[in-house]
Amino acid sequence: MMRGTRRRSVLRRRRLGLTDYRRRLKLLRGQQPRAVVRVSNTRTTCQLVTWAKDGDLVSVNVTGSDLLKKYGWPEGFSQKSISASYLVGFAMGKAAVASGESQAVLDIGLAASTPGGRVFSALKGMVDAGLEIPHGENVLPDE
């Protein structure tokens, strides 16, 4: 007679579709900071994140709203367009290089990896700012 359940418990963030733990573990094994790019409905966010036992530590954070405040981006323009994503990535890359980081690994989360899209536009900005991130040239957007 069988006892117990055959169900396998699924982690909450995986069940909600927020985290791919297999991909996250691969990124963490590299022991390099992660250049996290997230595109929401209103803006682009770029962060430089390092792993810690108590939780991830964000060392640099730049969002599309920072373009308005610090860099004079026109208020009526989109904060999630390809050009805005490039500028957010460039600002994050400059801040990361200024803080002493020289390398990172791109973390796009569960976003679709569309070549030439907003995520890779932010990647191009980070690379142009001097941050060394492994990538293929075919995914970057055109000039």
Regions found by a protein language model. Give the residues of each.
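Intrinsically disordered, Lys/Arg-rich N-terminal extensions and targeting peptides
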Residues: M1-D56, V60-N61, S65-Y71, E137, ...
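Positively charged, low-complexity, intrinsically disordered RNA-binding extensions
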Residues: D107-E143
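Amphipathic alpha-helical interface surfaces
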Residues: V58, A84, V88, M92, ...
